[in-house]
Amino acid sequence: MVDEPLEPLEPSLQNLIDQQSLKWIFVGGKGGVGKTTCSSSLAVQLAKKRDSVLIISTDPAHNISDAFDQKFTKVPTKVNGFDNLFAMEIDPNAGLNELPEEYFDGENEALRVGKGVMQEMINALPGIDEAMSYAEVMKLVKGMNFSVVVFDTAPTGHTLRLIAFPQVVEKGLGKLLRLKMKVAPILTQFVSMLGMTDVSADSLSQKLDDMLRVISQVNEQFQNPDQTTFVCVCIAEFFSLYETERLVQELTKCGIDVHNIIVNQLLYTHKSCSMCTSRFKIQEKYLDQIADLYEDFHVIKLPLLEKEVRGSDGIKAFSEHLITPYEPPATNDQK
């Protein structure tokens, strides 16, 4: 018996918009494929259905400020033209120093001293600094109770580290907590010399315990397809498709749901010049491969436009193509 070919899934991100249980949506892929435009557009569409939406840039280039033509910082800021869409930018390479100082406000000086002590301890554990930065941000974000959070991620290598950060942090914090008994007497003696009698190693330990609890919850949510999914963005070229397949495989290994792929920057008219014709044929070739590789995915096709997509109005207009498949205007150019 020969299996009948699967019916293509709807070429739209409507499935994500309708999935009210989603809490975390990651958008990523190779550099230069238009991830930021796509993630910003997705956030705009989600804002139509959800009470509050946050888009976070974890790319040091911080392109969402350029996309919305508005300056964002490490504190969630309302996007111009929206009542329920917020944006923030973090630099994962900055570690705990990137966090707002208000985060370390507490009943006493322990948390402020703890910032420096934690940073020094964390620096002794290779690979955990970036993960801890993500961990602190996730703790902040969870406390803000946004309906859904969209991550505009850095190129693939950084993205995979972001996805894996809960496991890295859980392992690293376990080591830190095991060091507590060794560090506590030294820390207590040090702060008493400075006259800060209300500072204790236990307060720092409690902070680590609290964070570990949050990260354990995040880890569970990341691997729950009802709460977390990943949207891959690519262009119809060899290297981008290769990177996308690698990303899909790595996400699957990590237990992260992925069933939507955006193919961006597609040509729809091509006979006006020889280069356009050549590019069109290349894209057709890789679109066929994408159809074969990802027959059980929603594949969304987005156009290469004549003008940049910038500003809230531009993003709003472009975001409609995530829901309703793009139809090029009729011209003599088309087949």
Swiss-Prot record:
Binding site for ATP: 30-37, 237, 264
Subunit structure: Homodimer.
GO biological process annotation, one example: tail-anchored membrane protein insertion into ER membrane
UniProt-listed InterPro entries: Anion-transp_ATPase-like_dom (IPR025723), ATPase_ArsA/GET3 (IPR016300), ATPase_ArsA/GET3_euk (IPR027542), P-loop_NTPase (IPR027417)
Keywords recorded for this protein, A-Z: ATP-binding, Cytoplasm, Endoplasmic reticulum, Hydrolase, Metal-binding, Nucleotide-binding, Transport, Zinc
UniProt-annotated location(s): Cytoplasm; Endoplasmic reticulum
Described purpose of this protein according to its UniProt entry: ATPase required for the post-translational delivery of tail-anchored (TA) proteins to the endoplasmic reticulum. Recognizes and selectively binds the transmembrane domain of TA proteins in the cytosol. This complex then targets to the endoplasmic reticulum by membrane-bound receptors, where the tail-anchored protein is released for insertion. This process is regulated by ATP binding and hydrolysis. ATP binding drives the homodimer towards the closed dimer state, facilitating recognition of newly synthesized TA membrane proteins. ATP hydrolysis is required for insertion.
UniProt-recorded name of the protein: ATPase ASNA1 homolog
Classification of source organism: Eukaryota, Metazoa, Ecdysozoa, Arthropoda, Hexapoda
